[in-house]
Amino acid sequence: MTIPRRFFLQASASTLLASMVHGCIKAPSDSSAFSIDQTLLKQIEKRGYLLVATEDDYPPFEFLVNGKPIGFDHALLDRLKKVMPFEIRQEILPWQGILPGVAEGKYDLALTAAGITDERSKWLDFTMPIAESSIAYIKRKDDSSIKSLHDLTGKTLGVQQGGVSLAAIPDLAAKLKQQKGTLGPIRQYRGFAEAYQDLLNRRVDAVLHNIVSLSVLVNEKPAIFELGERVSRQAYAAWAVKKGNHELLDLLNHFLNSQRENGELKTLQAKWLKITFENLPTQPLLPGDRPIQ
């Protein structure tokens, strides 16, 4: 898919910081009050808006339908705009520029479901997770030979070349070894469309991918594919800010936690991700907690 040109979406707040009282703002359409650090307020006032970066070729989190950006992250962004009294501008750009752009200070926030890794945590701070990004597998619905993770022993598996599904192979090998199983042949693909086609054509027995993408695929084609177990240790996805921007990080965590407590986060997960995560951490993870690099 061609990455769309950059454009801006403006928040609907009519007056910048109009409802601020001693650094505490009252959301016009929400009963929650958000305490905003004065340093952060001055930064936003100086520029006049908060600038977030997203992509739009990452379904179900961010994608385009008839030229309109939609998805899980966009739904959360709409909620964020409703409870913040300052303007929020969104710039859409290719994935490769999002995290470096935030790290360099070009953007305030990477509002995209980025996988939390130790390497990224060296130059970014992550919010509390918004979804799980663990690796699972799918198989053909009619393949009765695979009923559990142990049944992957000796099976031919499809993964994306250079992707996190390939990086999860050591985790799977360790799990199989614990169950006295062994890893079978691994086939690498440039993209998952080819891997899924080979699964249908019985050239591979299962395909490994992040659990959200697989859940969406199985929801779309329940008569063809079946979701299996996680093959990696748990991993998470979150938004990211520049390293050391604790004021913005605290504000975003407050917002996300409020969405979790009022049930909105779960509702949006069910709608867009076709799976809900009941036990996501409520605090940002520390370096070393992420298993997939």
Question: How would you name each of these model-derived features?
Answer:
Residues I25-S29, F34-S35, H74-V83, D143-I146, ...:
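Extended ligand-binding regions for polar small-molecule ligands
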Residues S32-A113, L252:
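Extracytoplasmic small-molecule ligand-binding "clamshell" domains
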Residues P4, D78, K82, E87-D151, ...:
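Acidic, polar ligand-binding/catalytic clefts
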Residues M1-S19, G23-I25:
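N-terminal secretory signal peptides and thylakoid transit peptides that target proteins
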Residues L77-M84, S165-Q188, V218-E220:
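Ligand-binding cleft/hinge of the Venus flytrap
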Residues G97-P100, A114-K122, A168-K175, Q197-R233:
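A ligand-binding cleft/hinge motif common to bilobed small-molecule-binding domains
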Residues Q90-P100, I186-Q197:
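Short helix-initiation/N-cap motifs at beta->coil->alpha
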Residues D56, A131-K139, I211, S215-N257, ...:
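Periplasmic-binding protein-like
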